[in-house]
């Protein structure tokens, strides 16, 4: 049972899982790899992580247990199960402004891909192999982390925090240039939002603001695109920012609104499928009735035909 991993570029890693169909319910791990100066590894559950009919896939900070207290990594993540059929799309999951830290050293999807797609002629399973490609853009690393001789970072209280991309100060919050407009709008519309937020540590302040931004970006997605996992994470994010001291009653209302829309979307989708099935059956009945009608017309025409002399002599 081989599992081969190899770097594709500065921020990409490829993992080939061999003999996929023979793997059991236990988690399997890729080799460790380095992106953005941080060590990572992939974790796959071929039979699903407490969920049936799916393969689950996660990315994890490999040496998280050995990192110093308070570390965090801001990333953009794309995970892909490669489809080798050129005419069919690969299965992709994407998340921006994603934070890894002590509480969340790993992140991924329980429902990465259905088992039904990993069989037959879908193109994802070829010669018993499944290929995973992960792309990680590392924007900021907070924590006292030092490079080893091999270029890999390790914890060391001497070194300073790495800033991969410059940030801007908005009312005491360090944010990326791409986040300035959104954060400014939030603080302008809700000036009391941070009155109860007492954290002085700038890294903690920034981490909390990024959780808030991620939550808003999640709720801006179409309900159709939001999975049950996304909604659970939204609940957790809301509790996190509330516990931190943010006044976000307005965001709580928006979350409930999105949940209601999600229920309507799911219920409506199910009802549409039911109606389509009923309509299909109705159309078939109409076709059957039309065929029966033509037969009856033919019988009537035959019955109306007059007898000729040939019928007698």
UniProtKB/Swiss-Prot annotation:
The keyword Ubl conjugation does not apply. Residues 10-136 form the MATH domain. CDD domains: MATH (cd00121). Keywords: Coiled coil. It comes from the Eukaryota. The keyword Coiled coil applies. Residues 246-297 form a coiled coil. PROSITE patterns: MATH (PS50144). SMART domains: MATH. This is MATH domain and coiled-coil domain-containing protein At3g58220.
